[in-house]
């Protein structure tokens, strides 16, 4: 029979390639083998794509009856040797099995799954029971390990003949980690759905990892994890999830702290005490290796050092990648577009230089980005004369520990009243609507201005020149009449024709005076607007993980089925700032107790000495009813 599964929860797709599920919906699976917690299948509406494996329960065929029941195995009961021998007979693959799409074939080639056997371990009734071995991410994705690169690699990379910079690669391992951060080949499917290190410790399993307790009798208990199932979401990749789960650790130096102050219009970054500007001049074509490699070099002169440095576009691209990785909640404007052909043409060089000037003006005026070490290294280190210092600064930036989850440790917020989460969420939603509307409006204005500028350069100029040409033709006609009294009239008509030609040229030059700067500024803003959806996703993600942690911990207790989903803690601990700061200690000291009289859980977090701000034992009742 075809592989089928039943949806245990509603799931709304957020990314391309995913499909939405409805609770109790029956789906057709393309393969029972999951890839990093995701299965591929077709829902009841005919949509094919990926969905979380823990959101569904595989519908398995009933086991064949024993030989004594008169089933197919009855004749073998009286034989000395079973017909199939003592080894279990392999079961043929289901008839409706379809190979995964091409995108997954390459991933599955390193290790092919063996055909299913008639033997099933005791936990096989559950989708992830039985502890079937799953291929490790290294095997599944080819085991590619990204290298940090040596000094020779650095020379090869930055001496490429193309001015189009390589796409920034991911640091560290190229394999996708498991949900619990492990990537060993022997970890089973159940082991890859651990709650988290902190939550496991909070339940008393400090000696090692404890897989979730799955209970086939309660389907709801099979799919609750504390982590975001979409491991490719911005909230996960930026380190926001790891931070709110208390997995960020690192020593923050005073120079690395980013201070937020209360300004006249609300919270804002602390201003740069030493503002500066930077000019970009003299784009020149340079060659090396006896002309075999060519590139465009720009001269940068920051006002606070007055020392010129020369940078290629690939250097700008490298800087952008480092800043975007280090500051997940700060919008780093996009660089001017790349171009593979015609990059040495005068018009393209001039246009790119103007775009880099806009980009540099914004970066130098930003209170946080302008003071960043990697940005200052980019502006002040003369790579052509001190190559060793340049490489040291590059390696330091690429090995920066204050990235990802640790970045949030560097934020220093002012002492203020507790934030109302509902008000915070309302403001974020309002800003989200504003950015969406502004993005659409900026795109429309850019299109309209570009079309109008094109008409001025071509259409208007051509039309005025036609009128001027007509007047000059009339003047030439009058010149055929050699009467003395018509000389002044002929000159006036010719002057009118020349005036129309000049007006046409003015129309062609006008966009450079007004519309081109507006469109350049719009391009910068469009880069910001493209960044805001990911930043908003990170901001909104920090508002709910505390509730999700509580929910996940409770679901782990004795396989209990929680029938009431709404959870919230008391107002004293519902502020985003307080939760983000103390969630690590809170989860470590978490104790859950069952109140038999009311059938509800009471959550208790204990004071751990003077290290944390808990002055006494506090009990937070959760509005959750348990059914066993």
Curated annotation (Swiss-Prot):
Signal peptide: none annotated. The keyword Protein transport applies. It is found in: Endomembrane system; Endosome membrane; Recycling endosome membrane; Cell membrane. Pfam families: BAR_3_WASP_bdg, PX, SH3_9. Residues 135-149 have a biased composition (Polar residues). It is a peripheral membrane protein. GO terms for biological process: cleavage furrow formation; endocytosis; endosomal transport; mitotic cytokinesis; plasma membrane tubulation; positive regulation of autophagosome assembly; positive regulation of GTPase activity; protein transport. Residues 150-160 have a biased composition (Acidic residues). Its main location: membrane. Keywords: Cell cycle, Cell division, Cell membrane, Cytoplasmic vesicle, Endocytosis, Endosome, Lipid-binding, Membrane, Mitosis, Protein transport, SH3 domain, Transport. A 1,2-diacyl-sn-glycero-3-phospho-(1D-myo-inositol-4,5-bisphosphate) binds at residues 312, 314, 352. Residues 276-386 form the PX domain. GO terms for cellular component: cytoplasmic side of plasma membrane; cytoplasmic vesicle; extracellular exosome; plasma membrane; recycling endosome membrane. Residues 421-628 form the BAR domain. Heterodimer with SNX9. Interacts with ITCH. Interacts with dynamin-2 (DNM2), SYNJ1 and WASL. Interacts with the AP-1 complex. Interacts with FCHSD1 (via the F-BAR domain). Involved in endocytosis and intracellular vesicle trafficking, both during interphase and at the end of mitosis. Required for efficient progress through mitosis and cytokinesis. Required for normal formation of the cleavage furrow at the end of mitosis. Plays a role in endocytosis via clathrin-coated pits, but also clathrin-independent, actin-dependent fluid-phase endocytosis. Plays a role in macropinocytosis. Binds to membranes enriched in phosphatidylinositol 4,5-bisphosphate and promotes membrane tubulation. Stimulates the GTPase activity of DNM2. This is Sorting nexin-18. It comes from Homo sapiens (Human). The lineage of its organism: Eukaryota, Metazoa, Chordata, Craniata, Vertebrata. The gene is SNX18.
């Amino acid at each position: 029979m075809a592989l089928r599964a039943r949806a245990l929860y509603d799931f709304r797709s957020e990314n391309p390639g995913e499909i939405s599920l409805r609770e109790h919906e029956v789906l057709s699976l393309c393969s029972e083998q999951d890839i990093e917690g995701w299965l591929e299948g077709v829902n009841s509406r005919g949509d094919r794509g990926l969905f979380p494996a823990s959101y569904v329960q595989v519908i398995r065929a009933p086991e064949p009856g024993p030989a004594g029941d008169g089933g197919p195995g009855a004749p073998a009961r009286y034989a000395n040797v079973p017909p199939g021998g003592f080894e279990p007979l392999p079961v043929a693959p289901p008839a409706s099995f379809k190979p995964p799409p091409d995108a997954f074939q390459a991933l599955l080639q390193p290790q092919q799954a063996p055909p299913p056997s008639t033997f099933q371990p005791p936990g096989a009734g559950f989708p992830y029971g039985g502890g079937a071995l799953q291929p490790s991410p290294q095997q599944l994705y080819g085991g590619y390990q990204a290298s940090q690169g040596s000094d020779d690699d650095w020379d090869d990379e930055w001496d490429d003949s193309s001015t189009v910079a390589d796409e920034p690669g991911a640091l560290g391992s190229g394999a996708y980690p498991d949900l619990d951060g492990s990537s060993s080949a022997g970890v089973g499917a159940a082991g890859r759905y651990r709650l988290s290190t902190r939550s496991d410790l909070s339940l008393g399993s400090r000696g090692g990892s404890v897989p979730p307790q799955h209970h086939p009798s309660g389907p709801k208990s099979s799919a609750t994890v504390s982590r975001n199932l979409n491991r490719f979401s911005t909230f996960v990749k930026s380190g926001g999830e790891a931070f709110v789960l208390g997995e960020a650790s690192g020593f923050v130096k005073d120079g690395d702290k980013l201070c937020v102050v209360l300004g006249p219009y609300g919270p804002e970054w602390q201003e740069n005490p030493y503002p500066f500007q930077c000019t970009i001049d003299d784009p020149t074509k340079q060659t090396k290796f006896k002309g075999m490699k060519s590139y465009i070099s720009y001269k940068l002169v920051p006002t606070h050092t007055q020392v010129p440095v020369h940078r290629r576009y690939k250097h700008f691209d490298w800087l952008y990648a480092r800043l975007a990785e280090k500051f997940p909640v700060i919008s780093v404007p996009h660089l001017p577009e790349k171009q593979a052909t015609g990059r040495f043409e005068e018009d393209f060089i001039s246009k790119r230089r103007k775009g880099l000037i806009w980009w540099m003006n914004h970066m130098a005026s930003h209170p946080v980005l302008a003071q960043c070490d990697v940005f200052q290294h980019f502006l002040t280190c003369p790579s052509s004369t001190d190559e060793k210092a340049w490489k040291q600064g590059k390696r330091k930036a690429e090995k920066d520990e204050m990235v990802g989850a640790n970045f949030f440790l560097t934020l220093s917020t002012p002492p203020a009243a507790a934030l109302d989460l509902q008000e915070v969420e309302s403001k974020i939603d309002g800003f989200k609507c504003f950015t969406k509307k502004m993005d659409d409006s900026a795109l429309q204005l850019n299109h309209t201005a570009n079309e109008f500028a094109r008409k001025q350069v071509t259409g208007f100029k051509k039309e005025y020149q036609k009128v001027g040409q007509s007047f000059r033709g009339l003047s030439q006609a009058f010149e055929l009449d050699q009467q003395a009294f018509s000389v002044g009239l002929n000159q006036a008509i010719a002057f009118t024709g020349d005036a129309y030609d000049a007006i046409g040229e003015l129309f062609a030059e006008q966009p450079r005076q007004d519309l081109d700067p507006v469109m350049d500024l719009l391009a910068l803003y469009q880069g910001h607007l493209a960044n805001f959806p990911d930043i908003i996703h990170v901001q909104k993600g920090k508002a709910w993980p505390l509730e999700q942690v509580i929910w996940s911990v409770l679901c782990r207790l004795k396989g209990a089925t929680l029938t009431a989903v709404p959870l919230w803690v008391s107002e004293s601990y519902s502020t985003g700032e307080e939760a983000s700061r103390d969630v690590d200690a809170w989860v470590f000291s978490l104790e859950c107790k069952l109140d038999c009289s009311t059938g509800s859980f009471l959550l208790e977090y204990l004071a751990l000495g003077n290290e944390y701000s808990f002055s006494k034992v506090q009990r937070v009742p959760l509005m959750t009813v348990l059914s066993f």
